[in-house]
Regions:
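Aromatic-lined substrate-binding rim segments of carbohydrate-active enzymes
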Residues: 217-315, 348-352, 466-473, 688
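Polysaccharide-binding and catalytic clefts of secreted carbohydrate-active enzymes
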Residues: 290-501, 505-506, 511-514, 521-524, ...
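A conserved amphipathic helix/loop scaffold
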Residues: 571, 684-911
């Protein structure tokens, strides 16, 4: 039976009566154990294996009619890693199941206790369907839920909310505005390095990054704390125009930037103190691509890639420009880059001489898939993101010449006696599909990792080239901003951070994760980047917070964007998410007003003003308060060796709920001499680890006063080609296994060890999907048999007696190891920190972010208490008033709510 995953949050209900009620509504399958109190609707799943199902009444339906179910419930107790799923079962007249749908797996995770929720799902009754029976299924870790009201009925569509829009800031008289702006001194901006981190300077003054990206509310956002405007549309498109934002290119090598100039005049009139980062859209137009077809992205069949607006539609032979379709193109193409550079030069030179350019302090590079130069397909398990266009092949060969130098060196690397630097081509689909993952050995492995590495390197070099052109032709110091990825949210075209940091780019941004992380019942989705790595390489990190409000127009299918119901929910989202960025070392954020007028409301502005004040405080205090003693390292290159075989980002929920805020780095950073010292080191899936990196870990991290954790496969894609020698270096005996014993490790609850205190159920947080009668876990493609008799077994592979989580304490050193991908739980991290001598700022269970003078908490479990080793003064970010002092503060908020406080060392202890 095939499962279809649908979720519709915006529905109307037309209630129907059930045909009859079940006498025994709870069923346990595949080893699950439960208890059910029908008098109050409390259902408890008591253990890890299997699924517990609560079956509602059957409802008589008519084939062809669409129905929806809505179930109210709240979770009273849970172990993070638990899940709940609403499913609708189609039954024929005899009661036999003939179909089933379930909510999306990503929405099944349960994070919050005592927060009422409503699950909604709709289904169209198919041929032969006589009844629909809703089911609530519990899987994963133990949890207790209170089942509330169930409603079921015909689906009655509700019109989508049209949004609330206000007037844009007006255009001033052009001639007079230009005269006024001609009197201004040209603005400058740059990134300096202070106390081991990048700092933004604007006209000689240090600034937090507090920006508004939009085209509507310049005045209001600046009045409430924004110091930077990032333009959105408004004449920044070089070649590819839209109906609402025409291109600047006028033909015959000429550009018209009057619309851009007008937008700058509007910004200045709205707030004369605002400084502007101009978003430059670098997409080519279809006419140019048709004239230069060798630059169009091709699959192996020679079919052209088709983009629709900023997304990727697929491959085809035609486009519909009325639907904003155009050809997808090759980022690495030198011809494309020259085409863009022509426009960049023209824009920079125009702004250099225009009075309106005096308020410009930088540029934001946009283009390609998602407007952020993501590879054209998010995932590509069948083709590996190979581009068969001639422009890509030519660029690849040029890079191979740079890397290998001679035909003979390339032949040895690719194990191909016929290949030359002039004939090399990207791998075939057959080669890509020949193995699930690739290492760095000569032959097909090296060929594929070379080609995928080039995909990332070429994108980074393109961005740097564009940035350097703008800097040169603008003629004064300015900052260049763009979007980028890290192992937290991996994209194959954006995994060359070291290359990106070589000059030309100053600021990197990442978009906050959409739902479910943004929901009030989740731990948040910002700070989703290796921020400590960017700080180490002097790249300023900022967060794109495109958070919707109650004013935002609803667009069909965008349930995942987590529209807040009102100011209270908006506050819960942005205080949590802005606080996480600042506490993790980010330099600020921008609110992205995508449709316009999202934040044009006193309540929204009040909340935004509070977050901007938090950013100012963090900029002032970050070097005056204790730093985190916990570091996490993720392997940037793992996705270059295969699609989805490991993912440090899948452990982010455990990190967010651990009660600690780590510095998150790339694996390469262990070699950086500027790397600070920590007490707890966590390495996620160091699959490409080298001997040099391993030695650095042994020297810097594997100390008597520190704890090292390794979670996931180690060494299998790098020069070791095996996990065994990596773990042997720490004195732990293991054997590589062709496949894992299971996909999930369960804590051994018979073991009494400080590391497993309050740990129960499975290891990790994400990765559980409730099916019909069982669950599917995050797949582990690699195995390891732990054979060390001296290691203490803390957990075993589910359904086996094989060790899956161990600790080895030897000569005062501590190693915690599991082969499970993302194999850490929030409580395990908290316990490991205590073993390392760290005082966790909070207990595990809530989403708590503490660092750089910011303490932000989002309540998911027990009341939030923040603790420090020394006396601190506390301040209310909304008012700036002192709210207390001491070594402990309670954040008063209800489940699903957020609160932040500012802190500094008490006067007598300031350093």
């Amino acid at each position: 039976m095939k499962y279809r995953f649908l979720f519709f949050p915006l529905m109307g209900l037309c209630l129907a009566e059930p045909l009859f009620c079940m006498e025994s509504p709870v069923v346990d399958t595949n080893g699950s154990r439960s208890s059910f109190d029908a008098s109050n609707g409390i259902l408890s799943k008591l253990n890890l294996p299997g699924v517990t199902t609560w079956r509602a009444s059957k409802y008589k339906v008519s084939p062809g009619q669409e129905y929806e179910a809505a179930l109210e419930f709240s979770c009273e107790e849970l172990i993070p890693g638990a899940a709940a799923s609403l499913q609708l079962v189609s039954l024929d007249a005899s009661g036999r199941e003939i179909g089933r749908i379930a909510d999306p797996a990503r929405f099944q995770q349960v994070y919050a206790e005592n927060l009422p929720q409503k699950l909604k799902l709709r289904v169209k009754a198919g041929t032969g369907t006589a009844f629909i029976q809703p089911e609530l299924k519990l899987g994963g870790n133990p949890l207790k839920v209170r089942i509330g009201r169930m409603t079921f009925g015909k689906y009655v569509p509700k019109p989508l909310f049209k949004g609330i829009y206000g007037e844009k800031d007006p255009m001033p008289p052009r001639v007079f505005a230009l005269k006024d702006m001609a009197k201004l001194k040209a603005s400058e901006s740059w990134i300096a390095r202070e106390a081991g981190r990048p700092v933004l300077y604007i006209n000689g003054k240090k600034n937090a990054y507090k920006a508004y990206k939009g085209g509507t509310d310049y005045r209001l956002m600046c009045e409430n704390g924004a110091n930077i405007i990032v333009t959105h549309g408004g004449g920044g498109a070089l070649y590819w125009g839209k109906e609402w934002d025409k291109q600047a290119y006028a033909g015959n090598g000429k550009f018209d930037f009057k619309r851009l100039e007008d937008n700058l005049l509007r910004i200045y009139a709205a707030n004369p103190d605002a400084k502007v980062i101009v978003t430059v859209e670098c997409d080519p137009d279809n006419a140019w691509l048709e004239a230069h077809p060798e630059n169009i992205y091709l699959n192996e069949k020679g079919e052209r890639g088709v983009a629709r607006y900023t997304g990727f539609k697929g491959f085809g032979s035609s486009i519909n420009q009325k639907k904003q379709e155009r050809w997808a193109w090759t980022y690495a193409s030198e011809a494309y880059q020259r085409h863009v550079i022509q426009g960049l030069k023209a824009m920079a030179e125009f702004l250099k001489q225009s009075p309106a350019g005096n308020i410009v302090i930088g540029f934001c590079l946009a283009g390609g898939h998602d407007g952020q130069y993501v590879q054209w397909r998010y995932g590509d398990e069948t083709a590996g993101h190979a581009d068969y266009s001639e422009s890509f092949q030519a660029a690849l060969r040029k890079w191979l010449k740079e890397k290998y130098g001679t035909d003979e060196a390339l032949r040895r690397a690719w194990n191909d006696p016929e290949i030359t630097l002039d004939t090399a081509r990207v791998f075939t689909g057959k080669e890509w599909r020949s193995k699930p993952y690739f290492d760095t050995e000569p032959g097909i492995d090296r060929k594929i990792t070379d080609c995928r590495t080039f995909l990332s390197v070429s994108t980074a070099r393109m961005l740097r080239k564009f940035g350097n052109v703008l800097k040169e032709y603008f003629g004064r110091r300015c900052v260049i901003q763009t979007w980028y990825s890290s192992p937290v949210w991996r994209q194959t075209s954006r995994l060359a951070a070291e290359e990106l940091a070589k000059g030309g780019i100053d600021i990197v941004a990442q978009v906050t994760d959409y739902a479910p992380p943004r929901l009030a019942r989740a731990p948040g989705g910002s700070a989703n980047y290796t921020i400590a790595d960017s700080n180490l390489h002097n790249l300023l990190y900022v967060q794109e917070m495109d958070h919707r409000t109650w004013r935002t127009q609803e667009v069909g299918g965008w349930n995942y964007t987590a529209y807040p119901s009102g100011p209270a929910e908006f506050r819960s989202q942005v205080i949590r998410d802005a606080g996480s960025v600042l506490a993790a070392g980010g330099s600020g954020f921008y609110y992205y007003d995508m449709f316009g007028s999202w934040y044009h409301d006193p309540e929204a502005l009040k909340i935004i003003r509070e977050t901007y004040r938090m950013a100012d405080w963090a900029e002032q205090k970050r070097n005056q308060v204790p730093r985190t003693e916990f570091a996490v390292f993720m392997d940037e290159r793992d996705r270059l060796h295969g699609e989805g075989i490991a993912n440090g980002g899948s452990a982010m929920k455990s990190l967010r709920m651990s009660g600690l805020t780590p510095d998150i780095y790339m694996l390469d950073d262990i070699l950086n001499p500027e790397l600070p010292e920590y007490k707890l080191y966590l390495f996620f899936s160091p699959m490409t680890i080298t001997r040099e990196q391993l030695n650095a870990i042994l020297e810097k991290a594997y100390r008597k006063d520190a704890v090292v954790m390794i979670a996931g496969p180690a060494g299998v894609c790098g020069p070791f080609r095996s996990a065994e020698p990596v773990l042997k270096a720490f004195g732990l005996q293991i054997q590589d296994s062709m496949k894992p014993f299971s996909n999930v490790v369960a804590f051994d609850e018979t073991v009494k060890d400080p590391l497993t205190e309050r740990c129960t159920g499975r290891l990790g947080t994400l990765g559980v999907t409730i099916r019909k009668d069982d669950v599917a876990w995050l797949r582990n493609p690699f195995g390891a048999k732990i054979t060390d008799a001296a290691a203490i077994v803390l957990g075993r592979w589910l359904g086996t007696s094989e060790p899956g989580l161990v600790v080895k304490r030897s000569e005062g050193r501590t190693l915690i190891y599991t082969p499970q991908i993302a194999g850490v739980s929030a409580q395990l991290i908290n316990n490991a920190a205590k073993e390392a001598g760290i005082l966790p700022p909070s207990e595990a269970g809530n989403a708590v972010y503490v660092g750089n003078g910011i303490a932000a908490g989002h309540r998911l479990a027990d009341p939030i208490v923040i603790r420090f080793r020394e006396d601190m003064n506390f301040y209310d970010p909304a008012t700036g008033e002192k709210s207390g002092s001491g070594r402990e503060i309670r954040l008063d908020c209800k489940p699903g709510e957020s609160r932040a406080v500012l802190y500094e060392r008490a006067v007598s202890q300031k350093k």
